[in-house]
Amino acid sequence: MARICHGFGMTVLAYDQYRNPALDGIVRYVELDELLRTADLISLHCPLTAETHHIINADTIKMIRDNAILVNTSRGGLIDTNALIDALRARKFAGVGLDVYEDEDGQVFEDFSDDVLQNEVVPILMSFPNVVVTSHQAFFTRTALQSIAITTMENARAFARGEKLVNEVKG
């Protein structure tokens, strides 16, 4: 995502506990509050841990500049859904894209076309004209799926050998 945005001439700000040397010259690392205050587009790309749970909440939403775009393709629990809905009702965001959402268990990978949705959040989110909700489709490209398979096998092999896991999520 950073490379794509950089390719379009965007200034790419990043907040991360661990700097990625592969992104040197592409992103400028800043503190979270600076990113929230200055970014026109905020795209979440992090695991769900105790530290990142509700990283976007009522307080952080207040820091986000008006008419920003918020995208979450990582984990639903990164965003406090009730705070997001309140912000959408207040017309805080120009747009929101959600490939994941809080409490989505049992709602994705199944066809509920002929059923009544039990999760009330999805219809509320979809009622906003500036919100797009997809069901874990953002990452389904041939290249991405191949990368997932290779990474999974490499991690399984390293685990079986007692080696350090390169993709271990700490936290």
Model-derived features: positions:
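Rossmann-like dinucleotide/phosphate-binding beta-alpha-beta segment
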Residues: M1-D66
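Rossmann-like dinucleotide-binding domain for NAD(H)/NADP(H)
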Residues: N67, G77-G171
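Glycine-rich nucleotide-phosphate-binding loops and adjacent flexible coil segments
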Residues: V71
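Conserved catalytic cysteine-centered active-site region
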Residues: S74
